[in-house]
Amino acid sequence: MQNTIINSATEKLSPFKTLTAEQENLVNDILSFTTKHIKQDYPAIFTVYGDAGTGKSVVLAHLFNEIQVAARTKEDSPLYQTTNYFVVNHPEILKVYKEIAGDLPHLYKKDFTRPTSLINQLDKKDETVDVVVIDEAHLLLSRSDPYNNFTYNNQLVELIKRA
């Protein structure tokens, strides 16, 4: 039963799933925004709103695949050789994204992580990243959670500081 649920979710979030025209336009708008702001020294935020089940996660999965293809293969892209992560603070959804990454040449499982893991990893190495795509942002912590090794006050703020 668990594998059936994961396989169904994997199909729904696959970057090979056909997008509606509206979703495709949104992916293109976000890519345009990202390439415009990638070389700036300050963060830029693009927020996608929508009710549950409207396809936000599908859009983000397609978007991140496009970003990583550009980052890893398109020498003429402003995104070429950028360091990018997809963050989700839900273990089962993260598992689905990692499953998808295992099947695609330009997505690596290590590209997908939980917010606290990314924040702590970047702090440890004293590094920043170029692009962070956040799915299910309402699940980000807005207070310290030492039990889960999050010692700051707001995960969104901390991710923005590191991007």
Residue ranges and their predicted role:
Residues 1-163:
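The feature marks helicase ATPase cores and/or their adjacent C-terminal helical subdomains
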